Amino acid sequence: FKWRKGTISDLGTVVGGSTPSKSKPEYYTEHGIAWITPKDLSVNKSKFIAHGENDITELGLKNSSASIMPEGTVLFSSRAPIGYIAIAAGEVTTNQGFKSVVPKSEIGTPFVYYFLKNALPTIEGMASGSTFKEVSGSTMKDVPALIPDSETLAKFNEFCGPLFGQQQMLERQNQSLAALRDSLLPKLMS
């Protein structure tokens, strides 16, 4: 097995986020484009996330520097606090409190997810700022990474991929059951 030295940029594309103007209510909606904030991850008890507290509209997306990231993107909060991690369960955008990683297809989401979880102390150590620590996009891209050979990576993804899929399905079922419980419980009490 031959591993090589690299950086997060070798694992995927680092993408920042943006906040559409809060003074423009037409930029926000309930059922629009998923827009995730670190606060959303602070209350997310799952490995996967599909929506946050607010969604944005096409107009909000167009009038900000937010970009849509694909399902499987590993969301990483880069400030306030550093290190909340979740996997996009569908297409999402984020606010500027993220430096997310869109995994290269040959690397895969599971490897990037576990890499970021394990690299958190290193990433925190690279953060800068006097009042609040923050990880910049260029710093995130330069975080050192050991990258396994393609055979090892393929075996890892072959093992983890189905587990991640099953976990995502179970998390969705739990959320559906919780919503059903929450709608039925008041009816039972009345």
Predicted regions and their residues:
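Non-catalytic DNA-recognition/assembly elements of restriction-modification systems
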Residues: F1-T19, D142, L146, S150-S190
